[in-house]
Amino acid sequence: MNAPLDRPANSVDPKLLEILVCPMTKGPLEYDAAKQELISRSAKLAYPIRDGIPIMLPEEARKIG
């Protein structure tokens, strides 16, 4: 499946970002394009994005400050 021409292949679909929440807190996520992560401030976790796919598993998340 190819990404639309108006966004890079490794980016996440904006519509998907609107509906995703942190699996731990059910709170909002912030997209960090530079690090390719979804940030949950309330859980203090950063979920990785691999090949444009968010990995929403707490055991795969990186702890943040």
Swiss-Prot record:
GO terms for cellular component: cytosol. Disulfide bonds: none annotated. Belongs to the UPF0434 family. This is UPF0434 protein BBta_0300. The lineage of its organism: Bacteria, Pseudomonadati, Pseudomonadota, Alphaproteobacteria, Hyphomicrobiales.
